[in-house]
Amino acid sequence: MKRRLLFLFAVFMVATSVGWGQTDLYVSTSGSDGNGGGVEAPLATIAKAIEKAADGATIRVAEGIYPQVSPIVIPKSITIIGSDSTNCIIEGQLDIQRDEEESVINVNLRNLQITKATTLSQGLINVMSKNVNLNLSGVHLHQLTAGSGDGWGKSSMGIVNLGKSYDSNSICDNVNVSLTNSCI
Protein backbone atom coordinates (compact mmCIF):
# COMPACT_ATOMS: atom_id res chain seq x y z
CA MET A 1 0.00 0.00 0.00
CA LYS A 2 2.79 2.43 0.90
CA ARG A 3 4.60 1.72 -2.37
CA ARG A 4 1.44 2.31 -4.34
CA LEU A 5 0.80 5.63 -2.61
CA LEU A 6 4.43 6.64 -3.07
CA PHE A 7 4.22 5.73 -6.77
CA LEU A 8 0.99 7.71 -7.22
CA PHE A 9 2.50 10.69 -5.40
CA ALA A 10 5.58 10.57 -7.65
CA VAL A 11 3.41 10.40 -10.80
CA PHE A 12 1.33 13.32 -9.53
CA MET A 13 4.43 15.44 -8.83
CA VAL A 14 5.89 14.77 -12.29
CA ALA A 15 2.58 15.44 -14.04
CA THR A 16 1.93 18.73 -12.24
CA SER A 17 5.48 20.04 -12.53
CA VAL A 18 5.59 19.95 -16.33
CA GLY A 19 5.96 23.53 -17.52
CA TRP A 20 6.86 25.06 -14.15
CA GLY A 21 10.55 25.12 -14.92
CA GLN A 22 10.03 25.74 -18.61
CA THR A 23 12.66 28.21 -19.78
CA ASP A 24 11.73 28.21 -23.50
CA LEU A 25 8.29 29.23 -24.71
CA TYR A 26 7.19 29.12 -28.35
CA VAL A 27 4.95 31.54 -30.27
CA SER A 28 3.41 30.92 -33.68
CA THR A 29 0.69 32.59 -35.74
CA SER A 30 -1.01 29.17 -35.79
CA GLY A 31 -0.79 28.84 -31.99
CA SER A 32 -3.35 29.57 -29.29
CA ASP A 33 -2.96 31.55 -26.08
CA GLY A 34 -4.75 28.66 -24.38
CA ASN A 35 -1.81 26.36 -25.19
CA GLY A 36 1.07 25.64 -22.85
CA GLY A 37 3.71 27.33 -25.00
CA GLY A 38 5.74 24.24 -25.87
CA VAL A 39 7.14 23.53 -29.32
CA GLU A 40 4.15 21.26 -30.13
CA ALA A 41 1.57 23.62 -28.58
CA PRO A 42 2.80 27.20 -29.17
CA LEU A 43 1.14 30.35 -27.93
CA ALA A 44 -0.41 32.84 -30.37
CA THR A 45 0.90 36.11 -28.93
CA ILE A 46 4.21 37.41 -27.67
CA ALA A 47 2.40 39.25 -24.86
CA LYS A 48 0.97 35.98 -23.52
CA ALA A 49 4.38 34.32 -23.74
CA ILE A 50 5.92 37.16 -21.71
CA GLU A 51 3.13 36.84 -19.15
CA LYS A 52 3.71 33.08 -18.78
CA ALA A 53 7.52 33.22 -18.89
CA ALA A 54 9.72 33.03 -15.84
CA ASP A 55 12.30 35.74 -15.26
CA GLY A 56 15.23 35.02 -17.61
CA ALA A 57 13.24 32.76 -19.97
CA THR A 58 13.59 32.59 -23.75
CA ILE A 59 10.66 33.11 -26.12
CA ARG A 60 11.12 31.65 -29.59
CA VAL A 61 8.93 33.32 -32.21
CA ALA A 62 8.10 31.51 -35.46
CA GLU A 63 7.95 33.20 -38.85
CA GLY A 64 4.90 35.41 -39.25
CA ILE A 65 3.39 38.83 -38.66
CA TYR A 66 2.34 39.63 -35.09
CA PRO A 67 0.12 42.76 -35.07
CA GLN A 68 -0.30 44.50 -31.69
CA VAL A 69 -3.30 46.58 -30.65
CA SER A 70 -1.51 47.92 -27.57
CA PRO A 71 2.17 47.96 -26.60
CA ILE A 72 3.81 44.73 -25.48
CA VAL A 73 5.00 45.34 -21.91
CA ILE A 74 8.23 43.62 -20.88
CA PRO A 75 8.45 43.70 -17.04
CA LYS A 76 11.22 41.13 -16.51
CA SER A 77 14.49 39.82 -17.88
CA ILE A 78 13.71 37.95 -21.08
CA THR A 79 15.14 36.90 -24.42
CA ILE A 80 12.92 37.03 -27.51
CA ILE A 81 14.35 35.25 -30.55
CA GLY A 82 12.66 35.41 -33.94
CA SER A 83 13.07 32.77 -36.63
CA ASP A 84 14.73 35.43 -38.83
CA SER A 85 14.65 39.22 -39.09
CA THR A 86 13.03 39.21 -42.53
CA ASN A 87 9.98 37.06 -41.83
CA CYS A 88 9.42 37.47 -38.09
CA ILE A 89 7.62 40.80 -37.76
CA ILE A 90 6.18 42.55 -34.71
CA GLU A 91 3.81 45.35 -35.76
CA GLY A 92 3.63 47.63 -32.74
CA GLN A 93 5.73 48.86 -29.87
CA LEU A 94 7.58 47.29 -26.94
CA ASP A 95 7.60 48.98 -23.53
CA ILE A 96 10.32 47.82 -21.15
CA GLN A 97 8.93 48.67 -17.73
CA ARG A 98 9.96 46.84 -14.58
CA ASP A 99 8.08 47.23 -11.31
CA GLU A 100 11.14 46.59 -9.13
CA GLU A 101 13.49 49.27 -10.38
CA GLU A 102 16.32 48.43 -7.99
CA SER A 103 17.13 45.17 -9.76
CA VAL A 104 18.59 44.99 -13.27
CA ILE A 105 16.44 43.83 -16.17
CA ASN A 106 18.15 42.21 -19.16
CA VAL A 107 16.14 42.27 -22.39
CA ASN A 108 17.64 40.50 -25.40
CA LEU A 109 15.95 40.79 -28.79
CA ARG A 110 17.28 38.76 -31.72
CA ASN A 111 16.33 38.21 -35.35
CA LEU A 112 13.19 40.36 -35.32
CA GLN A 113 11.65 43.12 -37.38
CA ILE A 114 9.75 45.70 -35.33
CA THR A 115 7.69 48.07 -37.42
CA LYS A 116 4.70 50.39 -37.83
CA ALA A 117 4.31 52.47 -34.71
CA THR A 118 1.80 54.57 -36.66
CA THR A 119 -0.96 54.87 -34.06
CA LEU A 120 1.30 54.79 -31.03
CA SER A 121 3.40 57.58 -29.56
CA GLN A 122 7.08 57.46 -28.61
CA GLY A 123 9.26 54.89 -30.35
CA LEU A 124 9.15 51.24 -31.28
CA ILE A 125 11.11 50.22 -28.17
CA ASN A 126 10.51 52.38 -25.09
CA VAL A 127 12.77 52.00 -22.06
CA MET A 128 10.60 53.17 -19.17
CA SER A 129 12.63 51.97 -16.16
CA LYS A 130 16.11 52.37 -14.79
CA ASN A 131 18.69 49.56 -14.59
CA VAL A 132 17.96 48.15 -18.05
CA ASN A 133 20.36 46.28 -20.32
CA LEU A 134 18.82 46.16 -23.80
CA ASN A 135 20.66 44.00 -26.34
CA LEU A 136 19.59 43.94 -29.99
CA SER A 137 21.11 41.46 -32.44
CA GLY A 138 19.80 41.15 -35.98
CA VAL A 139 16.90 43.48 -35.17
CA HIS A 140 15.44 45.90 -37.74
CA LEU A 141 13.37 48.90 -36.58
CA HIS A 142 11.59 50.82 -39.32
CA GLN A 143 8.46 52.52 -40.69
CA LEU A 144 8.33 54.99 -37.86
CA THR A 145 5.53 57.55 -37.92
CA ALA A 146 4.98 60.12 -35.19
CA GLY A 147 1.77 60.54 -33.29
CA SER A 148 0.18 63.97 -33.19
CA GLY A 149 -0.83 66.33 -30.44
CA ASP A 150 1.11 64.58 -27.70
CA GLY A 151 4.19 66.79 -27.63
CA TRP A 152 6.42 64.38 -29.51
CA GLY A 153 6.81 66.61 -32.56
CA LYS A 154 7.13 65.60 -36.18
CA SER A 155 9.40 62.58 -35.83
CA SER A 156 9.51 59.33 -33.96
CA MET A 157 12.52 57.35 -32.80
CA GLY A 158 13.44 53.70 -32.74
CA ILE A 159 14.51 53.48 -29.09
CA VAL A 160 13.32 56.03 -26.55
CA ASN A 161 14.44 56.37 -22.93
CA LEU A 162 11.34 57.70 -21.17
CA GLY A 163 11.47 57.10 -17.46
CA LYS A 164 8.20 56.84 -15.54
CA SER A 165 6.73 60.15 -16.65
CA TYR A 166 6.81 62.00 -19.91
CA ASP A 167 7.96 65.42 -18.71
CA SER A 168 11.36 67.12 -18.77
CA ASN A 169 12.26 65.64 -15.36
CA SER A 170 12.23 62.06 -16.66
CA ILE A 171 15.56 60.38 -16.10
CA CYS A 172 16.40 56.72 -16.45
CA ASP A 173 19.63 55.76 -14.73
CA ASN A 174 21.88 52.89 -15.78
CA VAL A 175 20.30 52.08 -19.15
CA ASN A 176 22.60 50.29 -21.59
CA VAL A 177 21.79 49.56 -25.22
CA SER A 178 23.93 47.17 -27.23
CA LEU A 179 23.45 46.71 -31.00
CA THR A 180 24.87 43.87 -33.11
CA ASN A 181 23.94 43.50 -36.79
CA SER A 182 20.89 45.66 -36.17
CA CYS A 183 19.33 48.45 -38.19
CA ILE A 184 17.60 51.40 -36.56
Located regions from the model:
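Positively charged n-region of N-terminal signal peptides that target proteins for export
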Residues: 1-4
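Bacterial N-terminal signal peptides
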Residues: 8-17
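Right-handed parallel beta-helix/beta-solenoid
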Residues: 18-48, 65, 83
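Extracellular beta-strand-rich solenoid/capping regions of secreted or surface-exposed proteins
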Residues: 47, 52-55, 67-81, 89-135, ...
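Beta-strand-rich solenoid/repeat architectures in extracellular/passenger domains
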Residues: 86-91, 110-121, 139-155, 172-184
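Extended, compositionally simple hydrophobic/Ser/Thr-rich segments
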Residues: 166-170
